[in-house]
Amino acid sequence: MKPTTIASLQKCKQDKKRFATITAYDYSFAKLFAEEGLNVMLVGDSLGMTVQGHDSTLPVTVADIAYHTAAVRRGAPNCLLLADLPFMAYATPEQAFENAATVMRAGANMVKIEGGEWLVETVQMLTERAVPVCGHLGLTPQSVNIFGGYKVQGRGDEAGDRLLSDALALEAAGAQLLVLECVPVELAKRITEALAIPVIGIGAGNVTDGQILVMHDAFGITGGHIPKFAKNFLAETGDIRAAVRQYMAEVESGVYPGEEHSFH
């Protein structure tokens, strides 16, 4: 199978072809996703909640991310694999580079970091040293204590303009992908159209170039609060492989996310 690359996603944006991505944390699910053609995966620090049982992503370490990245890479050798740099792993550009090197050696193709213009120097340093970067704006879970909970971001002209400015700054610094989480559809559309790089949404409506879901949300195996943007594809299909295919098909056709999964 031909490897999926950042250039593959860039072509999807140019061709206006939506694409699906998903979180993965282990060999078996990564292998299954790849076999069904879902070839863009993120080893997210969401594993702190979905795998480790914490109430936030904050306890996750670089070693945790590297461990799960290696497992996913063994299951999906040709996927485009993103890996989060967890909380306090990129406080300085030098620290970011050291920790990015660790997860890249474990098998990641790209690192994802949360934050806006304050990360410009870090993004520049990483890209200059051959570490591709995916930005993450909107609801950034590592900042949950600043936000006062998991809340929609970017509402209102001032907040929206600030997120757009952050997105443009990250792109100019060298970021090659951007995740937008829990922002109004109207803002997601502005940002997606303003950027040349692909934008992946989660809780950002169906106007972004791609979508991502935490796999536990996609299969309805998350306990407690269910995010508005989540959809249980397993409930509709009764089979994990069929659920993966359904998720991909609905993203590619624009059916998912629907209005009921979106914010304004």
Swiss-Prot record:
**Annotated function:** Catalyzes the reversible reaction in which hydroxymethyl group from 5,10-methylenetetrahydrofolate is transferred onto alpha-ketoisovalerate to form ketopantoate.
* Top EC group: transferase
Enzyme Commission designation: 2.1.2.11
Major localization listed first in the record, in broad terms: cytoplasm
Q: Which residues bind 3-methyl-2-oxobutanoate?
A: 45-46, 84, 112
How is the cofactor bound here?
Binds 1 Mg(2+) ion per subunit.
Localization, per the record, is: Cytoplasm
Q: Which UniProt keywords apply?
A: Cytoplasm, Magnesium, Metal-binding, Pantothenate biosynthesis, Transferase
A GO molecular function held by the record: magnesium ion binding
- Cofactors that this protein relies on: Mg(2+)
Where Mg(2+) is bound, by residue? 45, 84, 114
> PANTHER family this protein is in?
3-METHYL-2-OXOBUTANOATE HYDROXYMETHYLTRANSFERASE
- UniProt-listed InterPro entries: Pantoate_hydroxy_MeTrfase (IPR003700), Pyrv/PenolPyrv_kinase-like_dom (IPR015813), Pyrv_kinase-like_dom_sf (IPR040442)
Question: According to the lineage, what is the superkingdom?
Answer: Bacteria
Q: In which pathway does it act?
A: Cofactor biosynthesis; (R)-pantothenate biosynthesis; (R)-pantoate from 3-methyl-2-oxobutanoate: step 1/2
Reactions catalysed, semicolon-separated, are:
3-methyl-2-oxobutanoate + (6R)-5,10-methylene-5,6,7,8-tetrahydrofolate + H2O = 2-dehydropantoate + (6S)-5,6,7,8-tetrahydrofolate
Catalytic residues?
Answer: 181 (proton acceptor)
As for family, the record states: Belongs to the PanB family.
Q: What CDD domains does UniProt report for this protein, alphabetically?
A: KPHMT-like (cd06557)
Q: What is this protein called?
A: 3-methyl-2-oxobutanoate hydroxymethyltransferase
Cellular component terms, GO, for this chain's entry?
cytoplasm
Naturally occurring in which organism (per UniProt): Escherichia coli O1:K1 / APEC
Describe the subunit structure. Answer: Homodecamer; pentamer of dimers.
Query: Keyword Transit peptide on this protein?
Result: no
Instruction: State the Gene Ontology BP annotations.
Output: pantothenate biosynthetic process
